[in-house]
From Swiss-Prot:
Heterotetrameric enzyme that catalyzes the condensation of farnesyl diphosphate (FPP), which acts as a primer, and isopentenyl diphosphate (IPP) to produce prenyl diphosphates of varying chain lengths and participates in the determination of the side chain of ubiquinone. Supplies nona and decaprenyl diphosphate, the precursors for the side chain of the isoprenoid quinones ubiquinone-9 (Q9)and ubiquinone-10 (Q10) respectively. The enzyme adds isopentenyl diphosphate molecules sequentially to farnesyl diphosphate with trans stereochemistry. Pathway: Cofactor biosynthesis; ubiquinone biosynthesis. Its main location: mitochondrion. Its EC number is 2.5.1.91. GO terms for molecular function: all-trans-decaprenyl-diphosphate synthase activity; metal ion binding; protein heterodimerization activity. Keywords: Isoprene biosynthesis, Lipid metabolism, Magnesium, Metal-binding, Mitochondrion, Transferase, Ubiquinone biosynthesis. The gene is Pdss1. It comes from Mus musculus (Mouse). CDD domains: Trans_IPPS_HT. It holds the Pfam family polyprenyl_synt. This is All trans-polyprenyl-diphosphate synthase PDSS1. Its cofactor is Mg(2+).
Length: 409
């Protein structure tokens, strides 16, 4: 037990490391979740048991009402070695994203008025543009690391557009699958134009993204983004299923989280690194940063479903419970309230299930444990990106990982 705890602590400590060949991990898994080689005969600690030990031993855990408050552990990345605060990643990223949504609308090339209105509905400049911001910052950080180049290539900026288009297409399709009526504080495409037309609008955005991607002319990059689209579909199928065993259930949840959210960020980061730097070590650093930030982003999103109001989120809260989906806070809460198992297996389908499950989550430490897990993913992301040569953009990516943990919508 002591040896395993020591290994886990070494795996999660937050400190810079030299550039080297990063260890490959299974998508969607952090080090304490991974299985060891077959030759390792030491007893395996079930994931939830290990997390229970960690949560009781960690001095940086928060109460439910304080989980978004910054702690020394969370904020050790806030300053550079020179003592200066990091640049605002969003302001820095927008230097390369001026005209982003206008450029996307040009890519759509639509003559039919109704289809044009549907396809452009979410490209109104009111989104967070989280993915394009990460992509352009990663592009510059990798370019500087490679040859101190200060300029970003047009092909790298195109990846930012493609990433936002793929993401938006999935929002349109997800809203159809979930029968959602609001997003970003306004009616969904399917609510206004109907499900059939919404599906076609999402398809059109995906096809336009594919054309823009093909113009880049790099087969490796095309393959990476094609993998994203496959992951998105497989992730949606995973979300439709459930597992009876609690450890399988959590692994299932993390795999779904990787495929539905983190794969796009990870592969987009890797794509711009490939376009700007020939070193495969840098490609892996970019991928691992994007993967870990992406998983953390979704974990916090799942937390906000229980802790934010609908006005803040721009969409209904407790939405996942209403759809029969058990996210991190629910799975952790189930450890304290085993009666939730039956609710999870029947996908909260009986009258009163959603309200009872929500109360169980808020009475448990499910929110804190999910937030703590998100912290660990962000720590891993920071350790990866610190392997690159120091730059304003690299530091902004570190700051961005903190903003993932402290966001409220």
């Amino acid at each position: 037990m002591a040896m395993r705890w020591s290994c886990w602590r070494r795996g999660c400590s937050w400190r810079p490391t030299a550039v080297g060949s990063p260890r490959r991990e299974r998508p969607g898994c952090v080090e304490p979740l991974g299985t060891r080689a077959a030759s390792d005969t030491r007893a395996q600690i079930p994931y939830f048991s290990l997390m229970k030990i960690l949560m009781s031993a960690s001095p940086t855990m928060h109460s439910i009402s304080q989980f978004h408050q910054r702690t020394p552990a969370m904020c050790s990345c806030r300053q550079t070695q020179s003592g200066e605060k990091y640049s605002d990643p969003f302001k820095l990223g927008w230097r390369d994203l001026k005209g982003l949504y206008e450029d996307i609308r040009k890519e759509l090339h639509i003559s039919t008025r109704e289809l044009k209105d549907m396809s452009e509905y979410y490209f109104d400049g009111k989104g967070k543009a989280f993915r394009p911001i990460i992509v352009v910052l990663m592009a510059r950080a990798c370019n500087i690391h490679h040859n101190n180049a200060r300029e970003m290539q047009a092909s790298q900026r195109s990846i930012a557009l493609v990433a936002e288009m793929i993401h938006t297409a999935t929002l349109v399709h997800d809203d159809v699958i979930d029968d959602a009526s609001s997003r970003r504080g306004k009616h969904t495409v399917n609510k206004i134009w109907g499900e059939k037309k919404a599906v076609l609008a999402g398809d059109l955005i995906l096809s336009a993204a594919s054309v823009a991607l093909a113009r880049i002319g790099n087969t490796a990059v095309v393959s990476m983004l094609a993998q994203v689209i496959e992951d998105l579909v497989r992730g949606e199928f995973l979300q439709l299923g459930s597992k009876e065993n609690e450890n399988e259930r959590f692994a299932h949840y993390l795999e779904k989280t990787f495929k539905k959210t983190a794969s796009l960020i990870a592969n987009s980061c890797k794509a711009v690194s490939v376009l700007g730097c020939p070193d495969p070590v840098v490609h892996e650093i970019a991928y691992q940063y994007g993967k870990n930030v992406g998983i953390a982003f979704q974990l916090i999103d799942d937390v906000l479903d229980f802790t934010s109001c609908s006005d803040q989120m721009g969409k209904p809260t407790s939405a996942d419970l209403k759809l029969g989906i058990a996210t991190g806070p629910v799975l952790f809460a189930c450890q304290q309230f085993p009666e939730m198992n039956a609710m999870i297996m029947r996908r909260f389908s009986l009258p009163g299930d959603v309200d009872r499950a929500r109360q169980y989550v808020l009475q448990s430490d499910g929110v804190q444990q999910t937030t703590y897990l998100a912290q660990q993913y962000c720590h891993k992301a920071v350790r990866e990106i610190r392997k690159l040569r120091p730059s304003t953009e690299r530091d902004a990516l570190i700051q961005l990982s903190e903003s993932v943990l402290t966001r409220d919508k």
